[in-house]
Structure formats: structure tokens, C-alpha cells
Amino acid sequence: MSDLESSSSSSSDEEELERCREAALPAWGLEQRPRGPEKPGVDATNAKLPANQPSLMHKVDEHEQDGNELQTTPEFRAHVAKKLGALLDSSITISEIVKEPRKSEVQQGALEDDGFRLFFTSIPGGPEKEAAPQPCRKRLPSSSSSDDGDEELRRCREAAVSASDILQESAIHGHVSVEKKKKRKLKKKAKKEDSADVAATATSKAEVGRQEKESAQLNGDQAPPGTKKKKRKKKTKKASEASLSPPTKSAAAVPSN
């Protein structure tokens, strides 16, 4: 088996080297060597060549030019290798990215010892850490003594409400509501009466003023009786003053003669 594997690996290497050389040959100047019938590609693991069948690939040592078909010098090959290396270095970039641990991974690492959480509000820890539920206490049966019976009866009487109490309370509330309605109606009626009285007084005042204007227009320039009395008083006062003034003038004129 080792001989078969070594022969298969050497044949695959030779095939690959031959293909590279054929690809490197230019299309002019040199004639390509005749090639044998191509075999379908076989995987290296499944390639099992028999020991008695020789390989059809040309060996490098058997070439006439000792593997140097292009007749190149070592300096030229070094120069080409240097250029290719510079080209590859310029086109290839190596990025060093430090991957930060995710939050989920951190939480998972922190909770490895405590298990996992089913919900967000779950408390970490096993079931042994949870407090055991307290057992429900059963209600003790009531004693049949007379004191307990009397006390229970008293509580029932306090909690019980008779139908008469309910009717009485509803009647009181109903009476209060009726009285409130009556008071509201009386207030509304009083407001209406006050507004009617105000309107009546306003109309009466307007009617009196209108009548006075009409009477003044009918009488024309005649003055009212009050103004006549004032004029009479002024006339009598002037007459009394005129009657008192002549004797003083005559008394003053006598010494001049």
C-alpha cells in the first residue's frame, strides 16, 4: 500500500508540474510537445495506479535543456521572482481583527455553574436553592360550645340587614330628593317673577317718560306750574325793591336846592 501511495503522489506532482510548464510556454518560437491522451481528473485519495503501468508524464531530468526550456538565466529568474513577490505583497493584505466576546457568550460563561434561565426574571440557581412552599393550613372546625355559638349568632345579627331598614333608608333618600326638586322649582319661579317685575317697572318708566314728552309737545312753550310760581316771586321782589328806592333819591336831591 505504501508503494501505491508514493507512486500516486509522485504521478500527481508530475502532472501538475507538466501543466504549469505548458502554461508558461509562449505561443511563438517553440513548438509544443505532443501530449498523450488526457485522463479524467481523479482525486488523490482515490487515485490507485497499478504498479506495472508506467507513467506517461515527462520527467524533468530527461529533458534536453535540463528543465530550462525558456533558456533563462538565474539572474533573470531571480528578477522575475522579486517582481512577482512585490506584486503579491502589494495585492495581499492581512487584517488582524481581534474578536471581542459577545455579551451572550459572557453571560453564558458566567452562568455555566448556575445552569440556565428560562425567563429573564428567573433566579439563577438550582431547584435546591428555592424555598419549599409552605403547606396550607387547614381551618380548624368550630367548637360546639355555647359561647362560640352565641358569638357567631351576634355577628350574624350585626351583619344582617332587614328589609324594613332598606325600605326606610330608600324612603328617606326619596323624600330628600323630592324636597330638593321642590326647592329648585321655587327658586326658578322666584327668578322668573323677579325678572317679570323688573321688566314691568322698566316699561312703566318708559311709558311715564313718553307721556311727559307728549304733554310737553302739546303745551308748546308753556312753562310748567312750578316755573310760573318762581317767576311770580321774582316779579314781586323786583316791585318791592323799586318801591323802596325813590324816597332815597328825593332825600338826596333836597339839599342840592
Curated annotation (Swiss-Prot):
This is Protein CUSTOS. It is found in: Nucleus envelope. It comes from Bos taurus. GO terms for cellular component: nuclear envelope. Transmembrane segments: none annotated. PANTHER family: CHROMOSOME 12 ORF 43 HOMOLOG, PROTEIN CUSTOS. It comes from the Eukaryota. Plays a role in the regulation of Wnt signaling pathway during early development.
